[in-house]
């Protein structure tokens, strides 16, 4: 079986991910659900703030463009699992992200960087396992 190496440049970048209808709908549905549950705002605005902050931190620490881009994508997509349920949203979000990024033709290596960060982002159940998830 051949695997994509993830060495070549990504076909889609953070800005294109932000324009993706499926991802946007998942974020907004999650925001609606959380609003009904009494949580603070978790809209695309929140997602973009997390993404930009993640990118800024990795840039300040001297990471390369690819790693920064993946951190921004993970930050933007980190709460898509709320569209299913707040409970275990990090894990369901990682599964959703895997399928979406696979359909968008991301390399398996890049998919795993993003899904690992999403799956480990919940403050109650997650832990930093690499520079992107941190």
Task: Report the location of each language-model feature.
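Metal-dependent catalytic cores of enzymes that make or break cyclic nucleotides
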Residues: 85-95, 106, 127-128
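Acidic/His-rich, divalent-metal-binding segments that scaffold phosphate/diphosphate chemistry
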Residues: 3-90, 102-103
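Histidine/acidic-rich helix-loop-helix segments that form or flank divalent-metal centers
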Residues: 107-134
């Amino acid at each position: 079986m051949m695997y994509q190496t993830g060495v070549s440049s990504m076909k889609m970048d953070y800005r294109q991910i932000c324009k993706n209808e499926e991802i946007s709908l998942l974020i907004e549905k999650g925001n609606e659900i959380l609003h009904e549950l009494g949580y603070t705002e978790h809209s695309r605005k929140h997602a973009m703030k997390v993404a930009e902050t993640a990118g800024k931190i990795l840039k300040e620490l001297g990471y390369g463009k690819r790693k920064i881009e993946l951190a921004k994508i993970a930050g933007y997509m980190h709460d898509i699992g709320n569209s299913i349920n707040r409970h275990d949203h990090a894990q369901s979000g990682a599964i959703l992200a895997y399928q979406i990024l696979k359909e968008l033709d991301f390399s398996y290596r890049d998919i795993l960087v993003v899904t690992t960060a999403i799956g480990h982002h919940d403050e109650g159940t997650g832990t930093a396992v690499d520079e992107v998830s941190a």
